[in-house]
Amino acid sequence: CMIILIGLAVRSRRSLFSSTQQLLFSMLGYTSAAYIFFDMIWTLSDGVSTPVGITANWISNAVSFSLFAIACLIWFFYSETMQGSRLLTTPYRVVLLTLPTALVVVLAFTSYWTHTMFYIDTQGVYRRGALYMIQPIVSYCYVIYTSLHAFIQARKVESLQKKAIYRTLAFFAVPALVGGTFQIVYSAVSYTHLTLPTK
């Protein structure tokens, strides 16, 4: 998956999209690949009670929490840019839209001391914190909003080409949403567990 995402990111630089769209799609590919990498580290380190295992668990979770939210934000920006959204017309609005993701990043990295979003117990096992749900709520709101926006746009336009683009934007993230929901329900399952065969 990481190789495919990085390959798509590199190829997007040669596409017919605008420079902004190219940059956003490239960033999405690299961020998603990095997220999967750190999620794999969590899979390997969770339950390892050695100092190295616990440290790897802390770092991988803080980084993967942050990268997932950032990837959803980038997808939101990319999708809304493709749709010509008014939300991105001023720097002030862009900053406001970025603040929830910044909150997730701060909570993720301060959880080492506060345990608000997650913590690693003495056995080296990942546990959710009291404010864990902030991360999926923030991340999913970006994706759900832009997907619904694209779906509505697809119904409004008459151009078949634009309809196809908007429908792709509307349904592109559905598999990720389903997988993410599964991960929320079953807290011990990482994204890697959902994509790789296990014993």
Label every PLM stretch briefly.
Residues 1, 107-148:
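Extracellular-loop-to-transmembrane junctions of the mid-late helices
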Residues 6-10, 74-78, 139-159:
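Alpha-helical transmembrane segments in multipass membrane proteins, preferentially the mid-helix core
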Residues 52-62, 122-131, 190-191:
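Non-cytosolic membrane-interface motifs at loop->transmembrane helix junctions
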